[in-house]
């Protein structure tokens, strides 16, 4: 969010102060009133022709400001003291182009997310580019210009696309912008009016295989515009397909079970799509495209399908050393992490190296399976081996353990060897003592003298 430093600081301090207070009873959303507030965003103006709804990586871009004028925002106590955008009567060579956009004709449902993004530790990506009508229906259209702004709030925030039409209320002989060649207002802004917006609440969705998902997409349009069509398309790995379409009151599902509520579509501008019983074929980028009698805009939502792994640990063989096999089955996507840990009784757990893996297997559903094998060293008293599996579908790694004991035959052999060592040691000790006693008796025997 591109507030001037003083405004940004004031807003964040106000939010912090509101959060730090402890009122007797906090007002509910229904009790809170909406207060008209200017939302100011740092943007880039893209000066080359581009597709609707796409962001430029780099190239011909220049700095810009987007000022959404008097947007109704729920007042949580943090808006007190926030001043409206004043603009500047001086236009410098390196000053950013300022788009002043009225939102009187449409609703901005994600206004709070845009306003408080900076204070929430998030960022807003904003790009503005020229918008070209599909067909010019009136001669007066030739005297206007259109722009489309695409805004995304980071870390799972909403995404908004708005079509803005320039207003013709600039004074005769007004200063014109050097790049756009458009007349500027007395405050040095390009005055526009938002006539159409399309919003999605979440940029990326992760859902489990077999579950259901609702892909959010909503819109708001100015009076006089008619809704002509809604299309949901899926793009994945270079191919695209139509999932659902709605035109002039008729809906058609190309994907089995896909539904869109026509009453909500017409009453509240809710074009959300529901998909039941997700399969891996449902994974990809979903494009919600809304068409009106004059404008068209879209939102893109990536949907990731997840399948958590199931693990099982078993003993493969016992001779000469036991082998442990950890079977990991039914997971998606492909990447999985396997860690082996060994722990003796009363010892410190240690990671085991040298594990081998089987070839990767894929089921008819598209999920993956693999096995990991390690040679187990039970030691003299046994050891516990743990197979730990990490996957993107899991909040915490899965673990399974098995205690491995020494082979009974090996223990018997060791016992015989140990007993033999004790016997030989005792025998040697006995012989040594016997020899020592014999030597002592010879040295103490009386000597005979000849005479």
Curated annotation (Swiss-Prot):
The domain of life is: Eukaryota
Segments forming domain Ig-like V-type: 196-301
**Disulphide connectivity of cysteines:** 217-288, 326-387
Renumbered to this chain, the signal peptide range is: 1-20
User: What does UniProt give as GO cellular component?
Assistant: endoplasmic reticulum membrane; Golgi membrane; plasma membrane
Q: Where are the transmembrane segments?
A: 413-433
- Function field: Component of the antigen processing and presentation pathway, which binds to MHC class I coupled with beta2-microglobulin/B2M. Association between TAPBPR and MHC class I occurs in the absence of a functional peptide-loading complex (PLC). Expression seems to slow down and down-regulate MHC class I surface expression.
What name appears for this protein in its UniProt entry?
A: Tapasin-related protein
Organism (species):
Mus musculus
- Encoding gene per record: Tapbpl
